[in-house]
Amino acid sequence: MKKIKSLILAAAAFSLTAPVFTSCSSNDSDENLDNLVSEYTVNDNMVAAQKAKSGKDEAVLLVAFGSTWNNAFLAFDKTKQAYEAAFPNADVYFCFSSDICINRASVGENTDDEGNIVKRDYYEPRYLLHAIGAAKYSKIYVQSLQVIPGEEFAAVVASVKKFMNNGYIAKAHLDDDYLAKLQEDEAIFLGMPLLNDPEVDVPEVAAQLNALYAAEASQGVVAFMGHGNPDTYDTFKANVRYTQLEVALQALNPNYYVGTVDMPDNYKQDVLGRMQEKGINNGKVFLHALMSIAGDHAHNDMAGEGEEYWDPEEEESEDNSWFEYFKNKGYDVQVPVVGNHPLGLLELPGILNVWIQHTKDAEFLEDAYHSMYPEE
């Protein structure tokens, strides 16, 4: 197994210096202690029951940013099932890193296709990691379901480091000897995001996408919308993966483009500019989400239709959807759907297999553990 001491150190530095993000911040001192302990207890009991039932001694924890859309919940369910098939000797657990998604999913922000409000309970990585540790699994894999190794991935690394350093409230401290043994046995692993390796992952994902969308690319532009990070939060300079993916895709067909919601100089208007530089001023544009699931960004920022998604006085506004933007620029825009929804990357078997392979190749977290007790 590879060892990634440098990544842990970089993530630790990031967690100390980065600003607090509303979407995934938490502060134990600001929370009601009883409620906090209850969250740990709920997950501890759930994981203990699962381990007792299965008799398995390995655990896989899948970490997604999250969503509030039912089609995304179903995609997460199928992802978990795929992991259970790929790792028959492990119990598989799922969590969200976004507090906002956790809170809104629990109260039912969106409905299913029949109009029924859908509520789902998800928890932060710290609660599932604590529960897995309390159950004393002998081998733990934590798999990031992020697309790029950026801001959200750094938060995943920080969560694992906190777990290995017993960084919980006093009432939730784990057995320090157990954590030490995980480190000694090299039994705590981190699976990398989808586009982690520019030499391996980027061309593989490009090939998988081309296998799916070559027919569309033969008819017109195929534009993928990723998320990206603003410059301030461009952890590990991961935004470059979107540019690298576009280069790899265009080597297969020049009609592929990759833009983002948040990466500077790679918004929808920048994609249009690159298209026009090649003389593509009309024709078909097929839009696809380059995100793990098709949630709010895919349904609204990418595929939103109608007046609420278009302000002609502010054409390049982030509130204008990609669909309306390209349509009003004179293109024939299509958003392919399955059922009533666009697809996310986890719903594409060839892409999901890249994540699964990352778990199989997961890297041992060297020097993640430090005893909570002072050295004598």
Q: What are the roles of these predicted feature ranges?
A:
Residues 9-18:
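Hydrophobic helical h-region of N-terminal Sec-dependent signal peptides
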Residues 25-376:
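Extended amphipathic ligand-handling, pore-lining, and cofactor/metal-binding catalytic surfaces
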Residues 19-23:
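C-terminal motif of bacterial Sec signal peptides marking the signal peptidase cleavage site
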Residues 1-10:
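Bacterial N-terminal signal peptides that target proteins for export
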